A protein has these predicted regions:
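Conserved catalytic alpha/beta core of Sir2/sirtuin-type deacylases, generalized to analogous enzyme cores
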Residues: 1-282
Length: 282
């Protein structure tokens, strides 16, 4: 009996020597987190900042100048709500279930840090634009990042009228200056030692899978994306046994040169992942 597209993908993953996952904003949106939207969540949780500064989305909030005690109030609310979830989403659980028994690596521009809590090994996840759950010295006096969850909880508990008490503001352990969240949306974002180590592991993974059955799973990446999508498409083109599978609601882009080794899945990601996990023949 002929397989449907979900069964075909399930079989391709089963036969893979390694899985390379690429993920961007479309995956976040499928989980209910949209940094570009003036949606109900943003209006309810950031309404005071929205009114005071004319903000229209999360990303806008990172670009508008604020006093440090206000900026950390904005950031700590966001981190607690979107990057410190009690339970991984069904989507993330299903993605992990597909690859957990394989050699895998994740490259993502998403900063909400949802991969590791879902079971992915931290050393196999390269967050190209940093993580909301990390902070670093704003003065860049040294090249280290630090977890910020403990500080975030303290700040959200004591925030008053959109400001964090000055005594709770994170300070650099080296120079005593202000800390800031380690995310690419910050104009001062730079590549850290940790970033460079992850980048090296990414290239090592690709080299180790050269000539083997590499499956590229791409989640929520727009066709213009040069950071992740373009390199993944190029990799699919040069690797003879590679398969390229892209999931993106409302927009599927597959170049002609890799069309024969590719599959595009439009529509509801939650449904697609459930069906692929089943791997059943109807």
């Amino acid at each position: 009996m002929k397989m449907n597209v979900y069964q075909e993908i399930s079989q391709i993953i089963k036969e893979a020597d390694g899985i390379l996952i690429g993920a961007s904003n479309g995956l976040s949106i499928a989980e209910g987190y949209n940094i570009f939207a003036d949606d109900a969540w943003f209006q309810e949780n950031m309404g005071d900042f929205r009114e005071k500064y004319g903000l229209r989305c999360i990303l806008h909030g990172f670009s508008v100048p604020m006093k440090v005690e206000e900026k950390w109030a904005f950031v700590s609310r966001l981190v607690k709500a979107k990057a410190m979830q009690d339970e991984p989403s069904e989507i993330m659980k299903n993605i992990y279930a597909l690859v957990k028994d394989k050699e895998y690596f994740v490259v993502t521009s998403n900063a909400e840090d949802h991969f590791v809590p879902a079971g992915f090994e931290a050393d196999r996840v390269f967050e190209m634009e940093g993580k909301l759950t990390q902070m670093r010295c704003k003065n860049r006096c040294h090249d280290e990042v630090y977890p910020n969850q403990k500080a975030v909880l303290a700040m959200t508990e004591e925030e008053v009228n959109g400001r964090v008490p000055k005594e709770l503001l994170p300070k650099c352990p080296k120079c005593g200056g202000d800390m800031e969240v380690n995310w690419g949306a910050m104009s001062s974002f730079t590549e850290t030692k940790n970033w460079k180590e992850k980048a090296a592991r990414y290239q090592e993974f690709i080299q180790n899978l050269h000539g083997k059955k590499l499956v590229i799973l791409e989640f929520g990446i727009g066709w213009r994306n040069q950071m992740i999508k373009a390199p993944l498409m190029q990799l699919a083109a040069v690797e003879p046994q590679a398969r390229y599978i892209t999931f993106n609601k409302g927009e599927i882009y597959i170049p002609e040169e890799i069309k024969e080794k590719s599959i595009g899945v439009d529509g509801n990601l939650t449904v697609a992942l459930k069906e692929i996990r089943k791997g059943r023949i109807d």
